[in-house]
Amino acid sequence: MMLSCSPLTVPSSSYPFHFLPSSSDPPYDSIRNHPSLSLLHNCKTLQSLRIIHAQMIKIGLHNTNYALSKLIEFCILSPHFEGLPYAISVFKTIQEPNLLIWNTMFRGHALSSDPVSALKLYVCMISLGLLPNSYTFPFVLKSCAKSKAFKEGQQIHGHVLKLGCDLDLYVHTSLISMYVQNGRLEDAHKVFDKSPHRDVVSYTALIKGYASRGYIENAQKLFDEIPVKDVVSWNAMISGYAETGNYKEALELFKDMMKTNVRPDESTMVTVVSACAQSGSIELGRQVHLWIDDHGFGSNLKIVNALIDLYSKCGELETACGLFERLPYKDVISWNTLIGGYTHMNLYKEALLLFQEMLRSGETPNDVTMLSILPACAHLGAIDIGRWIHVYIDKRLKGVTNASSLRTSLIDMYAKCGDIEAAHQVFNSILHKSLSSWNAMIFGFAMHGRADASFDLFSRMRKIGIQPDDITFVGLLSACSHSGMLDLGRHIFRTMTQDYKMTPKLEHYGCMIDLLGHSGLFKEAEEMINMMEMEPDGVIWCSLLKACKMHGNVELGESFAENLIKIEPENPGSYVLLSNIYASAGRWNEVAKTRALLNDKGMKKVPGCSSIEIDSVVHEFIIGDKFHPRNREIYGMLEEMEVLLEKAGFVPDTSEVLQEMEEEWKEGALRHHSEKLAIAFGLISTKPGTKLTIVKNLRVCRNCHEATKLISKIYKREIIARDRTRFHHFRDGVCSCNDYW
């Protein structure tokens, strides 16, 4: 809003007042020490406040400005309830409020969620002929800063100059902060330069402005000029470095601070511990932790939360859990930090269990909680819990700052849990779609083999003027890769590099090389590797190894495996892939040698693990698993499945199982793969016709793929399986991947 008046000459206000008879205040001491006012100190409810106010009216204190100012001040500062509306109602009854009362009201409005109301009140006051003073301007300027009311702030600056308040340090600092928060750093610096009395507070206000906008050198220059630095100025500079990603510089500055006589406070330690977490400086973090304990900060909740985050991010979850468990009181940030730590370390099941414990504790989750837990639901395929979170978000978290990110996370969760239609519904419900939302939906369709839908979205994006980024093109190339669309993949790669002038990243090359390898174009794939500006990673070499197995190219497979082992010597997957290539070619001696080499190095193949969610509980199975409470029923269903599969003509392909095993044992090894155990459990745990969704940590093998196609037809079930790379939708004996994966 604009102050629709010239400075200090405002039209009469329509602000509604209900006047009480005026009277002069009785002697000051008799009011200040009155028992009724002392009751405010113990007031914790709005009902109690009304009773105290009624008593004040009964004994005549309602006509004294001092008593009313204390009542209004209590209302606006009460930590127990929202008292501003009551303060406004009291204010409207005062016939001639003095400047103290006006300033108290400005303070309340400035602290509220509607700071513009302070500006409206300011217009009202000067229209009544009252002049603001140096106590008025800091609150009104704070409102201009919070509401980004730059024009109004300029006008009030004029009032400051006219009334000669510009020399007041508080007003001076408030002007700097107002300009800073409105992004007017040049104006802020002009105010700073004109001040004959620069104190550490005004320096700090300007330092924060420069640092928050990335002008860290300007901030450092000002910081160096401060003659006597206090803890606030040190904090401003340290947090300035941290917030701009200069964590090492932040920590070096903290070390400099420790050489002075300035004692760090809560804000310092939270910033420093967070900088250690972000930079992975665990050793320095431990030293800081010792200092915290030695100097009496060990029970500070904010600092302990920061320490939990430090140890979580640095992989020391046992220490993080210990800190969490020892907290006498845990706030929502405590819970969020540890849940986020579990998610960060890929301990998704532990994250879900902690989330459920949080709900049982009575703590109310917020948007940050949901952004931490939705990836866990997505990874585990825990769609029932994901749906509950969706309902919670719709009911409790509408309009939060992270609303767009929450919707994008829901799209990702539904897509990764197998319900691509639900993901699409969430996408369509977003009125103002961010690029992240478009990308999440493109990726969702891609992983479900819906390349056509991915490209339809891309066309819609371009029509409405949304520019794709490098992530968009990873999604599109991934869609081509999952569907074997080589020509379209080449076209998209050219579009990205030529039309959008984007430099390909490792992920883009990975998709193209996977496409070329699947198509048997190994020479072209190697040429692309040679033209890359970066070294290929393990994902690229793995995709080529799988392609060699598919096309029976043992010689190239050996070469690619050698490259993979060089960059990932401790990865057993490279030996397993090479062993599979030898097995496909019937070279059993090489299979035995490769497996022996794997054993000699003490490495073990990552076991296949599949999970299925039943009634909001995620059940996990490994190959040959016999530890489930319903183990007997599961294996009974497995036997039934095998009988029906055999009747349907299914014959297991045992060519890739070690030669030394008897044929009967080979078939048994295939029969007990983790995805089959999960399917068997799903069949005995759900009603006929219920859709089953399986999540597997490895690529589904050819035998299980063929068997699952038939199982979907025999039991008349839709079975959705997510393996390491994509989704398979099995229905009526057919898979959505068309046997291309």
Curated annotation (Swiss-Prot):
Primary location class: plastid
Subcellular location: Plastid, Chloroplast
Disruption phenotype: No visible phenotype under normal growth conditions.
Transit peptide as UniProt keyword: yes
BP-aspect Gene Ontology terms: chloroplast RNA processing; mRNA processing; RNA modification
Xref: NCBIfam families: PPR
Function: Involved in multiple sites RNA editing events in chloroplasts. Involved in the editing of the site 9 of ndhB (ndhB-9) and site 1 of ndhG (ndhG-1) transcripts, which are two plastid-encoded subunits of the chloroplast NAD(P)H dehydrogenase (NDH) complex. Not essential for the activity of the NDH complex of the photosynthetic electron transport chain.
Family (UniProt): Belongs to the PPR family. PCMP-H subfamily.
Protein name per UniProt: Pentatricopeptide repeat-containing protein At1g08070, chloroplastic
Organism from which the protein derives: Arabidopsis thaliana (Mouse-ear cress)
Gene for this chain: PCMP-H12
